[in-house]
Amino acid sequence: MITVPWSVFLIWTKIGLLLDMAPYSVAAKPCPSVCRCDVGFIYCNDRDLTSIPTGIPEDATNLFLQNNQINNAGIPSELKNLRRVERIFLYHNSLDEFPTNLPKYVKELHLQENNIRTITYDSLSQIPYLEELHLDDNSVSAVSIEDGAFRDNIYLRLLFLSRNHLSTIPWGLPKTIEELRLDDNRISTISELSLQDLTNLKRLVLDGNLLNNHGLGDKVFMNLVNLTELSLVRNSLTAAPVNLPGTNLRKLYLQENHINHVPPNAFSYLRQLYRLDMSNNNLSNLPQGVFDDLDNITQLFLRNNPWHCGCKMKWVRDWLQSLPLKVNVRGLMCQAPEKVRGMAIKDLNAELFDCKDDMSTIQITTAVPNTLYPAQGHWPVSVTKQPDIKTPNLNKNYRTTASPVRKIITIFVKSVSTETIHISWKVALPMTALRLSWLKMGHSPAFGSITETIVTGDRSDYLLTALEPESPYRVCMVPMETSNIYLSDETPECIETETAPLKMYNPTTTLNREQEKEPYKNSSVPLAAIIGGAVALVALALLALVCWYVHRNGALFSRHCAYSKGRRRKDDYAEAGTKKDNSILEIRETSFQMIPITNDQVSKEEFVIHTIFPPNGMNLYKNSHSESSSNRSYRDSGIPDSDHSHS
């Protein structure tokens, strides 16, 4: 039997006890009472704190202090001792200066939504390993940034200064910056020297500033050889910027400016560019070949521009038709001239561009009558009008007629009501789908007023709804293949019609017309109508019987209650109701008399009428029921009831 020395046994016992107590010693690290600690993550956010609590564990790596009321005086000096902290979230607090006493090795600092005005070298030099700095929504201005404030931050990659008070780009930014956001400031000028050292910059956002072409130097972006994304949205540019870095630029955003022309060399050498957006500008045409160097373009957005589809834009149609399927071009819709407004540029044929050298005259054809629709004429847009030919009346519905060389679609329209138009069509060849578009005519349309839809090839009609009453509309259809590419040599078939006027389609008239148009499904009268008619006839018969019975009994009753009319022709009964005489009207049996009243009993302008009914309680009038049949029955005296004083 092997014996273990007692000393060795005691040593191993102590080691076991120490190992058992080790987890408890780690778990016993303190956590501020107002916070919650979870393995390096310290949550002290949303607690209305005015200062950072003390006693934060030394193993903390992420401090969540956002949405409090912490000010600069509330940052304790002991915070510098937390050497493992890498991320601090101090946004939405009450800081008015760049904070000090921050941990030295912090890499990501969020200070947005404070009121920070100044950025000094002393505050930034304490955090030399900073990689991301978020200062959005503060009050930083160009003069409040100390010269050389960032010279020790050689690891800074992201700098966000959106929505501040900057008028220029800060000087002396580190060369290591890869993303710079300066959107929604007051920047009006950018010198060529302010960005020349940022050779590692990949993303530059300058949206919502006051930049125009005079405030941009010709070579301001030239040295940004690693730039992949440039955004100049919501500025005041009148022309697309030139001399852009073409080595790596992939995204260019120029929408919501005042760009009215594009220099021919604006996009030269941008062979890596795959997304270009110039929507919401004032472009009416493009110089030929402006997109020739865009070898990798896949997304081109040109929405909401007043494109004039004249001869200068014919090359655009040819370029669009030569693009591969992967290229997505949006927004090239004609706004002028009038004859092609609302049509896609890629759908136009050569004759519609008004190029005199290529223009060929198309003979006007005669309208084909149709028995189902009103008299319809030809569509004036797709033909060349001769001086001696009158323009068709736009207040009627028209049927399209095209050259007999190519007749793919024939469209018919009919105004159903003040807000709806029924469209039907016939196709000469089988097709998978058709594109249907409509636009209100008679005025310069607002951007986006053209409505489009895709209908399947097996359909032959469509109902347009929610239209304006008594308004002209243009309707166009284009055949589509299964690959969703429009036929390159096919002109859209268009037609113009008008919704019905309001006076012709009031609710009652419309209902009656619809009822007249809709035939009965069965020739027999519905059972409900038969029952309703029978009930009405029975009710009328009963009502007539009751009226006859009342009339007969009333006549017999009035013969027993006849009274003398002799005195009523010249007495003062009628006068009593108009002169306001101070008298009493007394009726005894079949006669009556006026009894004067002394002035001391009743005031001067008053009278009192006492009615004394006959002892037998009978009516005084011969036919009392006849008075209820009219509002102006006449007495024997010839005076209407409205002129008598009733009691």
Curated annotation (Swiss-Prot):
InterPro entries: Cys-rich_flank_reg_C, FN3_dom, Leu-rich_rpt, Leu-rich_rpt_typical-subtyp, LRR_dom_sf, LRRNT, SLRP. Disulfide bonds join C31-C37, C35-C44, C309-C334. It comes from the Eukaryota. Pfam families: LRR_8. N-glycosylated. Residues 30-62 form the LRRNT domain. Residues 548-647 are cytoplasmic. Keywords: Cell adhesion, Cell junction, Cell membrane, Cell projection, Developmental protein, Disulfide bond, Endoplasmic reticulum, Glycoprotein, Leucine-rich repeat, Membrane, Repeat, Secreted, Signal, Transmembrane, Transmembrane helix. Residues 29-526 are extracellular. The keyword Ligase does not apply. SUPFAM superfamilies: L domain-like. It is found in: Cell membrane; Endoplasmic reticulum membrane; Cell junction, Focal adhesion; Secreted. It is a single-pass membrane protein. The chain crosses the membrane at residues 527-547. One of its GO terms (molecular function) is chemorepellent activity. Glycans are attached at N226. Residues 305-356 form the LRRCT domain. This is Leucine-rich repeat transmembrane protein FLRT3. One of its GO terms (biological process) is fibroblast growth factor receptor signaling pathway. Residues 1-28 form the signal peptide. GO terms for cellular component: axon terminus; axonal growth cone; cell-cell junction; cytosol; endoplasmic reticulum membrane; extracellular space; focal adhesion; glutamatergic synapse. Modulates the structure and function of the apical ectodermal ridge (AER) that controls embryonic limb development. Functions in cell-cell adhesion, cell migration and axon guidance, exerting an attractive or repulsive role depending on its interaction partners. Plays a role in the spatial organization of brain neurons. Plays a role in vascular development. Plays a role in cell-cell adhesion via its interaction with latrophilins that are expressed at the surface of adjacent cells. Mediates axon attraction towards cells expressing NTN1. Residues 404-502 form the Fibronectin type-III domain. LRR repeats lie at residues 58-82, 83-105, 107-126, 127-152, 154-179, 181-197, 198-223, 225-246, 247-269, 270-293. Residues 620-647 are annotated as: Disordered.
